[in-house]
Structure formats: structure tokens, C-alpha cells
Amino acid sequence: MMSAAICTLLAVIATTSLGLLFLSIIRRGKLPPGPPPKPIVGNLHQFPKVNRAQVFDQWHRTYGPIVGLRLGLKKLILVGSYQVARELLDRRGAIYSSRPRVVMAGEIANRGNHTALMPYGPKWKLHNRVHSALMNPTMVKRYQYLQDIESRQLVHDLLQGSTSDFGARIHRYSSSLLFALAYGRRLPTSDAFEIQENAHIAHQFINNLAAGRWLVDAFPVLNYLPTWLAPWKKIGEQLYQRKFGLLQRHTALALEKPVWNWTKHFHGPKKPAEASWEELLNIIGVLYEAGADTTTSALEAFVMAAVLHPDAVRRVQAEIDALVGGAARMPSFEDVQQLPFVDAFVNETMRWRPIAPEGVPHSLMKEDEYEGFTIPKNSIVIANQWHMAMDPATFTDPQAFRPERWLEDPKLPISAFGFGRRACPGRHIALNSMKIVMCRLLWAYDFDHAYENGRKVTIDPDNFVREGVLSKPAPFKAALRVRSPAHEKTIQSALRESEQDEDKILAHIAAGLA
């Protein structure tokens, strides 16, 4: 039988929950319009677990660009237009820059050290200061030297690729790039332990972040229960210990390296005084953990777009060939700046299939008013990037893949990296990766459907897998064929001529930072 203390605790939890529910009912205010709620549960019964983009899209069409929902004790605001997102999340960022409380993935499995989930405050500002120091445009320009080398290897690796392993080779590129910067070591093969282990940890993190997986996220007061009544605590602690052990291993090896890397950069005189050892490991680690998967997903979406839209590929190839002389040389970062259709292809890929359809939710730090509606304190605010990208009022024929729209109207909005103070800190390096990899792959390869037993393997452009806030193409097959023997020869010589010694590569980057 349960002890009197446990019974008392459960009674307190129940009473507190009912009290909070009562207060939320009597203090409703005038929320933005939305589907009619039911007593107590609000709109929980209507909130989609699958096909979320379609349901949200219908709500915006019915109720407008800002939709209000009640999810039990919580209020959720869906923002479906760039204008509203910029007003609330950008211009009013001082009060819209926090995050909803996430007990399992944030507080337990990461001990409050995951930057993306942190509430706005001194701790997040510390993380953001370090990330900005490493990812500002000046620093990122130095990283192009490494991106040049890694993308040469990717283009070369795909010469021997199959119709189904291009994703693994892309993942190697994005993982090796960030791992070399963070810890001073490149990852030459896609089966490297560091890549596989990080993928496992990232997968566990995303699973724990999924809405509805853990009751404690819906009712945080349950976290006051003792461990034997709260099995999620043990699970979360085991996940954290596995992750932190990996970070310690990476850090120890990085500090032994003779040359510059992010870890060494912030473990010397530049170490923030207020950052503990554990926190600093997490600050660096999250850049590798988050950046590898997001860049991979975006580039896989690019391959899908290239297979499905050969006319757009032929046009961009003609532009590249005219500048670099066909197969004479591989395009460079300097060339990318002179290739407007390449830039348009990148923008259209990010719009056509956004990898974070709803972004990472924001949380309101104090009550606000907008267009006569009340947005209560602690409301969850979701920037519905999918709806924004598919809004015919902004993008003519939004379902079509049309890179030329960005040449016809260069002022079209982009939201792929989020809004306001919580915009992706790695957006500059990610965009550089997108541009150089797409440009070089379009120069080097023709993209086609795979064929099996003489039959074309179809690709469903809507078959994407949701993992937490991320969306990536479900596994698909594609044939990447080198455009000519001359292209293949140039690809091979480009890799041969590039520096392969990681210490020399990082020393070159560091020399420009002095």
C-alpha cells in the first residue's frame, strides 16, 4: 500500500491541477479565433497527431492567419503568415523568445542544457553568446575552406554511390564538417562511430520531444513524484549519461589536438567565466548534434526535387556550365555568388519542403494583445512555416517547384531558419553548405529515377517522416549519374588536389581568425 506521504502528494497534485484548470477557464480573455473547444479538454480532441500540416492549413483557411487553441491548461497560438510572425516573433521578440517547458527531453534527458529548449534568460544568453561567437558571418566565411574540401569529397564519394546510399554520404558530409570544427577531426566514412552514435542520441532526443509521449510533459507537477513512481526519471538519466559520456570522450580528444577547434577555442582564455565544464561541453555538442541532421534532411529534399523537376535542373546546369566552362573545373564559392539560378534553386528547395514545418515553438513571457485579441502569458506560439510556404497569396502556384519565382520577385520571404531571437544560430554555415553542395552536385550529376527490373521506381514528394519538430524525406531511391567522363576526371583531380590533413586544414582556418 502507498504511504500516507505519497497519498498526500498525489492529492496535492490533483488539487493543484484542478485549481490551475479552473483559473484557466475563468481567465480566458479573447483568444484569436479557432475551432470550438470543449469543456476542460479544450481542443485536445481535435489536435492532430498525424497529417498535422493539412489540419493546421484548414484551420488557417477557416479562421485566418492567427488561430487560438486551448489544450487542457495550455493555450496554443498558430501563426500562419509572415506578416504576423514578423510582428510578434521579430518586432516583439523581447517577450516572444522563450520556450515552452519540456520536462522529459529538456529538464531530465538534457539536465536543462539543450540550447534549443531553454527558456529565455541568463543561461540561454550565455549559450547564444558562445554560438554567435562561433557562427557569426565573419567566422563562417573562414569555414568555407573546410566546406570546399568536404564537398569535394562528397561529390567524389557519389561516383561510387548506389541508388539508395546518397543520404548516408550526404550525412557524412554534414557530420564531418561540424565534427572537425567542434572537435578537430574529420569523419572520412559514413559508418564512423561518431556519426552512428550521434544519430542514435539525436533520434532518442527527438522521440522524447514528441508531443504526447510522456505524461509528465502534459502535467509537469508529476515530476515531483519519487523515482519509483516516475520511471521516466531513470530513462532520462540513462540517456543523459550516455550523451554526456560521448561529449566527454569527444572533448578529451579535441583538447589533445595540436591545432584550433571550437572546443580548444573555449577551453582556454576565452572560456566564459560563468560556464561550468559540463555546460560548456553541451554548448559545443549541441551545434554538432543539431546541425548534422538538419543539413542532411535539407539536402535529401534537394535530391528529391532535382529528380522530380528535370527542366529546372537543366536550366541551372546551363547557368553553371556557362560560368565555369562545362567540365573544365568544379564551381567554387566565388562562382556561387554569380549564379542567381543556383541561389533560387536553394531558396525554392527550402520553401517547397521545409524541414521544420512548424519550427521550434516559442513561449510568451507576458500577456500580449494583437489585433484586439488577447494572447495569454505562457502561451505556446507556433510559426506555421508550412502554411506560410504554401500560401497562394504570397507564392503563386505554391505546390509547384519553380525556382524562377525568386528571380521574378527577389523580395519573397524565407522562414526556413525561424524568427526573432531564437532563429537558428547555425543558419549562415547551413546556407553555405546548401549552396556549395547543391551547386557542385548539379554541375557534376544528372538526376533521374532509379529503375528496378526495368521499371521506374516512383518517388512520392509528400512522403516525409516526422521526427519531433523535424520533417525529412522517407527513404527513396534516386540515380545520380556523372554527366560525362570529363566531369569524372575533374572530380577526381579536384579531390586529389585538395588538402587532406585535418590539422593543416584547421590551422589554415585558425590563421585567419588571429
UniProtKB/Swiss-Prot annotation:
Gene3D superfamilies, per the entry: Cytochrome P450
Catalytic activity, as annotated: asperaculane D + reduced [NADPH--hemoprotein reductase] + O2 = asperaculane E + oxidized [NADPH--hemoprotein reductase] + H2O + H(+)
Protein name according to UniProt: Cytochrome P450 monooxygenase aneD
Keywords, alphabetical: Glycoprotein, Heme, Iron, Membrane, Metal-binding, Monooxygenase, Oxidoreductase, Transmembrane, Transmembrane helix
Subcellular location: Membrane
Amino acids binding heme: 424
GO molecular function, one term: heme binding
Record carries keyword Aminoacyl-tRNA synthetase: no
Cofactor(s) for this UniProt protein: heme
Transmembrane parts of this sequence: 6-26
SUPFAM superfamilies, A to Z: Cytochrome P450
Function: Cytochrome P450 monooxygenase; part of the gene cluster that mediates the biosynthesis of aculenes, a unique type of norsesquiterpenes that contain a nordaucane skeleton linked to an L-proline moiety and are of mixed biosynthetic origin. The pathway begins with the synthesis of dauca-4,7-diene by the terpene cyclase aneC using farnesyl pyrophosphate (FPP) as substrate.
Record-listed E.C. numbers: 1.-.-.-
Metal-binding found in the keyword field: yes
Short name of any one Pfam family annotated for the protein: p450
Pathway: Secondary metabolite biosynthesis
Similarity annotation: Belongs to the cytochrome P450 family.
GO CC terms: membrane
Main localization (coarse): membrane
Superkingdom per UniProt: Eukaryota
Glycosylated position list: 113, 261, 347
Consequence of gene loss (knockout): Abolishes the formation of aculene A and accumulates asperculane C as a major product and 14-prolyl asperculane C as a minor product.
Bilayer topology annotation: Single-pass membrane protein
